[in-house]
Design a protein with these regions (language model features):
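Non-catalytic, solvent-exposed interaction/assembly segments
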Residues: 1-105, 109, 149-151
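Small-residue (GG/TT-enriched) beta-loop-alpha framework at ligand/catalytic clefts
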Residues: 3, 12, 22-32, 69, ...
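Phosphate/pyrophosphate-binding loops at sites that engage ATP/ADP/AMP, CoA/4′-phosphopantetheine
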Residues: 59-72, 231, 353-367
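Active-site neighborhood for divalent-cation/phosphate handling
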Residues: 76-178, 368, 398-401, 423
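Phosphate/ATP-binding catalytic cores across multiple sugar-kinase/actin-like superfamilies
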Residues: 147, 151, 171, 175, ...
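Glycine-rich phosphate-binding/hydrolytic loop that grips phosphoryl groups
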Residues: 166, 171-174, 219, 226, ...
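Phosphate-binding glycine-rich/basic clefts of nucleotide- and phosphate-handling proteins
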Residues: 208-347, 373
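Glycine-rich phosphate-binding loops at beta-strand->alpha-helix junctions
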Residues: 245, 366-386
């Protein structure tokens, strides 16, 4: 195993932005440099990296501009067609039996067309668990070999040494849960709102319990704005960034939790992994364990049909209010009307995941929801989710668990971009946990 570095750079290559965070190990860990730069257009999509040369050139520039000189790197591996993660309940067994189970199950259930994969698994030891329980939990990761090789190739082009290739749910667990002791007392849901995908990861007492990925993100909101307002997507994206806001006074009236009858409805769990039959062997493989591959991010789900927009026509002015609205306010209403069905769908999927977690973890309840990623800072989104789900919701702060000593950027810059840096900081924290 590679020697644990004292300083490492976490690298998060997204479809819109490349994010880097340099962390020095310590108690507490120290965040020494960060950087964010646009991903070259067309170089990365929902399935993974398409243009390694363009990504490598952009990453090399970003590291130089950010003052990051360390060579030890932890890369995030992501993409709905590149990586999956599962938390599985399997019969309790010894390591040799578990290895056989995993080898057989991974070969039977590889979710990719190309069978060449890297995989890893780890037994989950939860605080206070009953040693006589007939079952145990295992976190399983499977990554496309080509995706792993692509990251190693990029590291070589940039002159980096890949200490580890990690996955988003565990990185978010480090930056938002493990580095913040008060977050380890109960269950927390982390919603990472990206451009092409949204992840829902639930942690119980600091440990990953339920990872899920939805194939929907900010780009779908951009397309919704473009279609409703009949604009080019580039203009719609700019309008979304400038004006997207949850207008609470425009939300259709409903029950406190946005479901018939109030409270949480009983979902069909469509798109949520089913509870496996008792006694059935479950998934995985050690198949040439990959150095540093920590468990990946969930499997893309087939999204439910988006409900028709409740805004079939422009709202009539309320009595006593002027009939005409300022142009900017009217435009903001139009943008909200365009994205509302997607926000409603997001809330439905969060609720579905919460109910699934509750069904599998008797007595455990989610105390709060944390938002990160580019969509996390849509004004009032946290309030909308909290009101709809009935769980306190806020924008996550990955800076709470580290000491800030960033040399190239002021604290204001780092704080204002913290929601984008949660994965990169979690990658940089890899040697610390």
């Amino acid at each position: 195993m590679a020697k644990q570095p004292s300083v490492a750079v976490g690298i998060d290559i997204g479809t819109r932005f490349i994010k880097v965070a340099e962390v020095r190990a310590g108690k507490p860990p120290v965040l020494t440099n960060v950087g964010i730069a646009p991903t070259p257009e067309g170089a990365v999509d929902a399935g993974g990296i398409l243009d390694k040369n363009a990504v490598a050139a952009a990453l090399k520039r970003l590291l130089a501009e950010s003052g990051i000189s360390t060579k030890q790197a932890i890369f995030s591996i992501a993409g709905q067609n590149a990586v999956v993660v599962r938390v599985l309940e399997v019969p309790r067994m010894n390591p040799s039996e578990l290895r056989t189970h995993m080898d057989w199950e991974i070969q039977r259930n590889i979710p990719f067309a190309d069978p060449r994969v890297q995989s890893a698994y780890e037994i989950v030891h939860r605080p206070g668990e009953d040693p006589n329980d007939p079952n145990m939990e295992v976190v399983l990761a499977v990554a496309q070999q080509d995706a792993v090789d692509g990251l190693v190739d990029i590291a070589d082009k940039v002159g980096l040494e890949p200490y580890a290739i990690d996955v988003e749910p565990l990185a978010l667990g480090r930056s938002l849960i493990l580095s913040q002791p008060d977050m380890q007392q109960g269950a927390v849901a982390v919603i990472n709102l990206g451009a092409n995908a949204t992840s829902i990861d639930i942690y119980d007492r600091g440990l990953l319990s339920f990872p899920r990925v939805l194939p929907t993100g900010g780009d779908m909101m951009t397309r919704a704005v473009a279609e409703r307002l009949m604009l080019p997507e580039a203009e719609a994206e700019q309008l979304k960034v400038q004006l997207a806001e949850v207008l609470m006074d425009q939300v259709p009236l409903g029950t406190p939790f946005g479901a018939p009858g109030g409270g949480f409805y009983t979902p069909t769990l469509g798109g949520v992994p089913p509870t496996p039959p008792a006694g059935m062997p479950f998934a995985g493989s050690e198949s040439a364990p990959m150095p540093g591959l920590d468990m990946p991010g969930g499997e893309a789900e087939t999204p439910p049909e988006v409900p028709p927009s409740p805004f079939a026509a422009e709202p009539s002015p309320e009595p006593g209010l002027p009939a005409a609205q300022p142009a900017a306010d009217a435009r903001k209403v139009q943008v909200f009307q365009a994205i509302y069905p997607l926000l409603e769908e997001l809330v439905s999927e969060i609720r579905r995941s919460v109910e699934y977690f509750r069904s599998r973890h008797t007595g455990a309840d989610i105390g709060q929801i944390l938002l990160c990623g580019g969509g996390a800072v849509i004004p009032n989104l946290d309030q909308f989710i909290a009101t709809s789900i009935g769980i306190p919701t806020s924008v996550a702060n990955p800076l709470r668990g580290v000491q800030l000593n960033v040399r190239r950027h002021g604290p204001e810059y780092v704080a204002s971009h913290a929601h984008l840096l949660a994965v990169a900081i979690g990658m940089g924290l890899h040697p610390c946990f």
